[in-house]
Amino acid sequence: MAGGGAPAPKADEPQPHPPKDQLPNISYCITSPPPWPEAILLGFQHYLVMLGTTVLIPTALVPQMGGGYEEKAKVIQTILFVAGINTLLQTLFGTRLPAVVGASYTFVPTTISIILSGRFSDTSNPIDRFERIMRATQGALIVASTLQMILGFSGLWRNVVRFLSPISAVPLVGLVGFGLYEFGFPGVAKCIEIGLPELLILVFVSQYLPHVIKSGKNVFDRFAVIFAVVIVWIYAHLLTVGGAYNGAAPTTQTSCRTDRAGIIGAAPWIRVPWPFQWGAPSFDAGEAFAMMMASFVALVESTGAFVAVSRYASATMLPPSILSRGIGWQGVAILISGLFGTGAGSSVSVENAGLLALTRVGSRRVVQIAAGFMIFFSILGKFGAVFASIPAPIIAALYCLFFAYVGAGGLSFLQFCNLNSFRTKFILGFSVFLGLSIPQYFNEYTAIKGYGPVHTGARWFNDMVNVPFSSEPFVAGSVAFFLDNTLHKKDSSIRKDRGKHWWDKFRSFKGDTRSEEFYSLPFNLNKYFPSV
């Protein structure tokens, strides 16, 4: 060609898929609710999905505290009640995303550390011991909540996340989902004859059946969780009443049986949880510092979860001020958890973020309806306990799909990055590898020795180091964030490689008109609490 120019591309030459600020093909976004009957069913699905964590955390903690079935049932009710309140607060005044805020596994190691501390060994009565430990956990959570409230409401976290780019969001959001792999198939395998059918039916109903039976109403993919859970729950109940587990080992019976008479029998018919129901909180400086570090880890993880939720709700990237506001209200959620005595702090539910992807419904109203179900079934204890008795392998099968969706949501931000850049490859590969490898070392060491790699005489200091390095998204996100903001950042071509130019318009609340549509406060509160 004359002049040495490159030939014009042919019309049929393959072109890359164009990057999208908002995820296309979503049926209902934040501000477009589905019809009421459909919204109520979808809200009930969200309630079913968040039950897994709600039951697993008290199951792990309450027996170690000294509590029995009655205390466990009360803690489950309390977690449900608090989750309903916190979800409403987050959807109304926080980020306003359809994010469920429930109990978090991140706080469990610190709570276990409080349980194992020697200061409760002099209490012989197990119920008294349970209440003393719960009051100590309450005190630690109340103090720890101040960290997120200060960072969020002061705008300090806003200044941090302004440096977040698509390349550093990939490891953070990706491992928020993929980092929870231990709760997936290992949980399914605890009762493979129930867990595996649930996983297969869920995939078939949600992915294959809509293409076989084209109803045009998205019934199967939208309500796949209800279909799959009901079918396998009935099947599991038939196995239970048929005597399939009568001679099985106790662990098998716990995982497989549907007649958990203990939790259903112990749950009261009607009970409204109230603040300080276990007594006045007690405070210990070391435990408060350890819980504060767990709160900071939950803050980082929830930042990634909020980004994933915004993607699957077909919203634009959150402006830093909105993300900071959401973190502030998550601090309020931890405070409420401490006041009511849930045994663990609160963070964004990753499994419910994955459910948004499965249903393709990112409506705020649906999640608010789910919050109503949480509060309703927490007060009517017997009915809530029936749903809480769903075998854990069924819930673990749901996790296999939902955590995968959230991880894939993190990978989707690669569309904004230059994948032909060696800088990009190094940051992505190194951060993801360390995000998997470092927590593996810490968790493996703890499983073998019974304590973490950092093992000094100060238990609170051990927790402050061991907890963050046991979190995959915290390690991966921190490494990626540091490298992305220190490695040849001033080079002009690097900015495009990072994908930062795609998010420039979302640096401030008024930088894009869509931000007001998705994230503005209700009741004209933006006039009094303006976002920047």
Curated annotation (Swiss-Prot):
<dbReference type="GO" id="GO:0016020">
    <property type="term" value="C:membrane"/>
</dbReference>
<feature type="transmembrane region" description="Helical">
    <location>
        <begin position="223"/>
        <end position="243"/>
    </location>
</feature>
<comment type="similarity">
    <text>Belongs to the nucleobase:cation symporter-2 (NCS2) (TC 2.A.40) family.</text>
</comment>
<dbReference type="GO" id="GO:0022857">
    <property type="term" value="F:transmembrane transporter activity"/>
</dbReference>
<dbReference type="GO" id="GO:0009506">
    <property type="term" value="C:plasmodesma"/>
</dbReference>
<feature type="transmembrane region" description="Helical">
    <location>
        <begin position="289"/>
        <end position="309"/>
    </location>
</feature>
<feature type="transmembrane region" description="Helical">
    <location>
        <begin position="392"/>
        <end position="414"/>
    </location>
</feature>
<feature type="transmembrane region" description="Helical">
    <location>
        <begin position="361"/>
        <end position="381"/>
    </location>
</feature>
<keyword id="KW-1133">Transmembrane helix</keyword>
<feature type="region of interest" description="Disordered">
    <location>
        <begin position="1"/>
        <end position="24"/>
    </location>
</feature>
<dbReference type="Pfam" id="PF00860">
    <property type="entry name" value="Xan_ur_permease"/>
</dbReference>
<feature type="transmembrane region" description="Helical">
    <location>
        <begin position="192"/>
        <end position="212"/>
    </location>
</feature>
<feature type="transmembrane region" description="Helical">
    <location>
        <begin position="75"/>
        <end position="95"/>
    </location>
</feature>
<feature type="transmembrane region" description="Helical">
    <location>
        <begin position="463"/>
        <end position="483"/>
    </location>
</feature>
<feature type="transmembrane region" description="Helical">
    <location>
        <begin position="163"/>
        <end position="185"/>
    </location>
</feature>
<feature type="transmembrane region" description="Helical">
    <location>
        <begin position="426"/>
        <end position="446"/>
    </location>
</feature>
<dbReference type="GO" id="GO:0005783">
    <property type="term" value="C:endoplasmic reticulum"/>
</dbReference>
<keyword id="KW-0472">Membrane</keyword>
<keyword id="KW-0812">Transmembrane</keyword>
<feature type="transmembrane region" description="Helical">
    <location>
        <begin position="137"/>
        <end position="157"/>
    </location>
</feature>
<feature type="transmembrane region" description="Helical">
    <location>
        <begin position="97"/>
        <end position="117"/>
    </location>
</feature>
<protein>
    <recommendedName>
        <fullName>Nucleobase-ascorbate transporter 6</fullName>
    </recommendedName>
</protein>
<keyword id="KW-0813">Transport</keyword>
<dbReference type="InterPro" id="IPR006043">
    <property type="entry name" value="NCS2"/>
</dbReference>
<dbReference type="GO" id="GO:0009505">
    <property type="term" value="C:plant-type cell wall"/>
</dbReference>
<dbReference type="GO" id="GO:0005773">
    <property type="term" value="C:vacuole"/>
</dbReference>
<feature type="transmembrane region" description="Helical">
    <location>
        <begin position="39"/>
        <end position="59"/>
    </location>
</feature>
<feature type="compositionally biased region" description="Basic and acidic residues">
    <location>
        <begin position="10"/>
        <end position="20"/>
    </location>
</feature>
